[in-house]
């Protein structure tokens, strides 16, 4: 007969065998984020020679920044590079990139001379009238600072 204790041991064994390194993310409200910071939403880092990713529609609308991770903010890990910035972009429509309109970008070398003003000549933030429909954030124009800590998932 199978007992609760036997089931508990099997669950513990399977959990132990399937542990994986992960990085836990915590969000914080921060009104002083730069284009180089790790964040959800906001204004991205964009190198001088980089064009903002666009969707597949005939209008080629710019994608919106979902998240940006500055790899130097991460704890030691075997998941992400040690340096550079990883960005996650999503479509500016009601599907928010769930089908085809998303992109992941990695910049290994960061030009610290680029300014927010330079980025804003290329990147158009979401129109305030579209925030509620096309933003995954609440409030819809929010920008959140990210901090990271090493963890284990089971």
List each language-model region with its residue ranges.
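Preference for intrinsically disordered or flexible, low-complexity segments
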Residues: 1-154
């Amino acid at each position: 007969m199978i007992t609760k204790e036997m089931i508990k041991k099997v669950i513990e064994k399977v959990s132990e065998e399937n542990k994986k390194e992960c990085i836990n993310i915590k969000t914080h409200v921060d009104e002083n984020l730069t284009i180089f910071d790790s964040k959800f939403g906001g204004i991205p880092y964009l190198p001088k020679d980089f064009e903002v990713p666009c969707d597949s529609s005939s209008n080629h609308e710019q994608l919106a920044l979902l998240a940006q991770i500055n790899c130097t903010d991460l704890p030691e890990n075997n998941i992400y590079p040690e340096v550079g910035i990883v960005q996650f972009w999503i479509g500016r429509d009601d599907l928010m990139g769930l089908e085809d309109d998303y992109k992941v970008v990695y910049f290994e070398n960061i030009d610290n001379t680029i300014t927010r003003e330079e980025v804003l000549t290329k990147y158009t933030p979401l129109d305030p009238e579209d925030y509620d429909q096309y933003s995954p954030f609440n409030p819809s124009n929010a920008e959140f600072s990210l901090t990271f800590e090493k963890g284990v998932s089971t």
